[in-house]
Curated annotation (Swiss-Prot):
Keywords: Glycogen biosynthesis, Glycosyltransferase, Transferase. GO terms for biological process: glycogen biosynthetic process. Its EC number is 2.4.1.21. This is Glycogen synthase. It is an enzyme of class 2 (transferase). Pathway: Glycan biosynthesis; glycogen biosynthesis. Belongs to the glycosyltransferase 1 family. Bacterial/plant glycogen synthase subfamily. Synthesizes alpha-1,4-glucan chains using ADP-glucose. Gene3D superfamilies: Glycogen Phosphorylase B.
Length: 478
């Protein structure tokens, strides 16, 4: 089984969010299961310098982008048993930032065609091309409309498209069809690519892929509804026979408190008390009162409305009347950043607002915190709650998407469950469930058992990789 995993980012080379984690961890797990899996991403300027210097040039060729004929270099590097390819073009990818440029349509039109040209240039034919999010959305379109019709090399390659966040669809002016792809407007007028008055990369992928996946069971159901479907819900209902939800996992090699070299004191489920040394160290480092008995409630997140920040802003002053400490790590919308900076200023030794993304600090926060907040408005899967479980920080989540699938509400009478949850997007419900969690926290026997439940939760990639592998096999036999 040969699989080409195509993404716009991949850890440890470069990442901006959960997609990068998936593209770094899932292929590694598939390789362990005997799959010949290779990953391809753009060669951005910001790729980790230490790794960038190890990339080996393979070959170059030209790629047609409408009337343009652009240079494409292919570099490669083997990491953790997986071959990574890097598509090189200085004009498109040697810039500040991966996304948000005026010509993103052209940049990823080039990338998508370069990927299809690359596999023939390298004479490596995958059974499956697994595409991820809108940046790779035109690959299934190009494959079906052009490459399979013109060249027998491509005729039996199947495509999978994974939706990591349906809110980002890649919609551009219809002029890109002739300008970037050399197509007429038929695909626009027949609505296969038409989204409002534009061309949608994601819509094209949904229409032309052989299978569609998303990152949790609940999110697969949610995006078929008007509330969550971002106006593609009707199409996903139509395609529901080929839509599957497969839960993300986390990389147990990277996120393991037993041997994590970014935290102060290693620990596991058999010596949970060592977690308190991490807590005291973090309190000291962040200027909080050093007291292991005060619960630390943490968020490591993008500071956006999707993450439920409106709810936390609403209750923050009431919440801080409790004997707690609040730690925030992340960047995002300025009004949220300013609010948490103000709380930090006002409450000093009770609040630490770290308005930056700092991976080292994030690991320390997971290891030191007692509770981890994710009151998201919507959450396709969520990785934060999975990492928190691994480190024995108890998730407090809203029941949506992957949060609903991975967090089982604690039952104080049976001792079952691995976190706390609430249903309605309501600030008072959030405050109520946090205060309930605080009540359980002060019952040390119950809390200790809850932490063990959390740390014993299995959220590795192994089970999910089996589901992907079964899907690949099913597709390749069609």
């Amino acid at each position: 089984m040969r699989v080409l995993f195509v993404a716009s980012e991949a850890h440890p080379f470069i990442k901006s969010g959960g997609l990068g984690d998936v593209a770094g961890a899932l292929p590694k797990e598939l390789a362990r299961k005997g799959v010949d899996v290779r990953v391809v991403i753009p060669k951005y300027r910001e790729i980790n310098n230490e790794l960038k210097n190890k990339l080996r040039f393979n070959k170059w060729f030209n790629v047609d982008v409408g009337w343009r004929n652009q240079y494409c270099g292919i570099l490669e590097y083997e990491y953790d048993g997986v071959i990574y390819y890097f598509v090189d073009n200085e004009y498109y990818f040697s810039r500040g930032g991966m996304y948000g440029h005026y010509d993103d349509a052209e940049r990823f039109a080039f990338f998508d065609r370069a990927v299809l040209d690359m596999i023939k240039q390298l004479d490596w034919k995958p059974n499956i091309i697994h595409c991820n999010d809108w940046q790779t959305g035109m690959i299934p379109v190009l494959l079906k409309l052009e490459y399979m019709r013109k060249d027998m090399f491509y005729w039996d390659i199947k495509s999978v498209f994974s939706i990591h966040n349906i809110a980002f669809q890649g919609v551009f002016d219809p002029v890109i069809l002739p300008e970037l792809f050399g197509y007429d407007y038929e695909q626009y007028t027949n609505t296969n690519l038409k989204f409002d008055d534009g061309v949608g990369f994601m819509k094209g992928a949904i229409n032309y892929s052989d299978m569609i996946t998303t990152v949790s069971y609940s999110y697969a159901e949610e995006i078929k509804t008007p509330e969550f479907g971002e106006r593609l819900d009707w199409l996903l209902r139509e395609k529901s026979y080929m839509l599957r939800g497969i839960l993300n996992g986390i990389d147990y090699d990277e996120f393991n408190p037993k041997n994590d070299n970014l935290i102060n004191k290693n620990y596991d489920v058999n010596n949970i008390n060592d977690k308190y040394e991490n807590k005291r160290n973090l309190q000291s480092e962040l200027g909080l009162n050093v007291n292991e008995n005060i619960p630390i409630i943490a968020m490591v997140t993008r500071l956006t409305s999707q993450k439920g920040l409106d709810l936390l802003v609403n209750i923050s002053e009431r919440l801080l009347q409790n004997d707690i400490q609040l730690v925030i790590v992340g960047t995002g919308d300025k009004h949220y950043e300013d609010h948490f900076k103000w709380l930090d200023y006002k409450y000093g030794n009770k609040v630490s607002a770290n308005i930056r993304f700092d991976n080292n600090l994030a690991h320390k926060v997971y290891a030191a915190s007692d509770m981890f907040l994710m009151p998201s408005l919507f959450e396709p899967c969520g990785l934060g709650q999975l990492i928190a479980l691994r480190y024995g920080s108890i998730p407090i989540v809203r029941e949506t998407g992957g949060l609903k699938d991975t967090i089982r509400a604690y039952n104080e009478y049976t001792g079952e469950g691995n976190g706390f949850s609430f249903y309605n997007y309501n600030a008072d419900e959030l405050l109520h469930i946090i205060e309930y969690a605080l009540k359980i926290y002060y019952d040390k026997n119950k809390w200790s058992n809850l932490v063990k439940n959390a740390m014993n939760s299995n959220n590795s990639w192994s089970k999910s990789a089996d589901e992907y592998l079964n899907m690949y096999k099913e597709l390749s036999y069609r």
